[in-house]
Amino acid sequence: MLRKPAVAGMFYPDDSEELVKTIEDCFLHSFGPGKIPDIESFEGNDYPVNVMVPHAGFQYSGTIAAHSYCELAKNGFPEVFIIIGPNHTGLGSEVSVFNKGEWITPLGNIQVDEEFADTLISFSDFASADFAAHMREHSIEVQLPFLQYFSNDFKIVPVVLGSQTISAANDLAAAILKAGEKLDKSYCVIASSDLSHFNTQERANKVDGFVLEDIENMDEFKLLEEIIQYNITMCGYGPVMTTMILSKMCGKNTSEILAYKTSGDISGDLSSVVGYASGIFK
């Protein structure tokens, strides 16, 4: 299965040279890390970090996403990136794993790690092989050019969550852990999520603050509780909960929020904004 770009030319440039320039601008922007890191080498099986990244158009969230990709480059790349995003289309299964083929971007093709994907599915009560959830979903696609900017020497396991429950998060985290151990492969989990949607800047800063505090405290239960209590429209809380749970299973018990902004900080329109944050679990 070849997964063609769904949002190239909209969320990011569809021309490879323009895309590279856009990514570099994200790193060098005052909201970004302020530098373009060199990619280091990584050896071994226990990759030291997992990350959280936003998934809006690069003009809005690319500078914030660059903070997490700066950390990944500094640690070197593992063999596999497991990229978990929410389901914006409503298609597919509870936990949809794109288990065979390649993903195409303007920077080249990326192979799916079919062995890791199928092994993950075999250990899960929720996950199944499914392409439908992925074909128009942007939350995973927009991460790939940032990775390809540094290297094409990696594979991916794309996972879309239709079910964002604690049960599904625990199940998926355990399945990833077991698959990694069985295959003896190094991997990093990328949780793709924006924060609150279409609030005023003042309210976004307030409710996103609740979310970010819960993430820093590595408390998936409080995160879900406050999302419900305050009606926080965070689209990818399931991927974030999964990554927090898995990180703790692997002994990565601390997290750090690297950057936070809203779309209003970029556009100047503070009446209706979306929140974006990058974070690292280590």
UniProtKB/Swiss-Prot annotation:
Source organism of this protein record: Methanobrevibacter smithii (strain ATCC 35061 / DSM 861 / OCM 144 / PS)
InterPro entries: MEMO1_fam
Name of the featured protein: MEMO1 family protein Msm_1438
Family membership: Belongs to the MEMO1 family.
PANTHER family, alphabetized: PROTEIN MEMO1
Pfam families: Memo
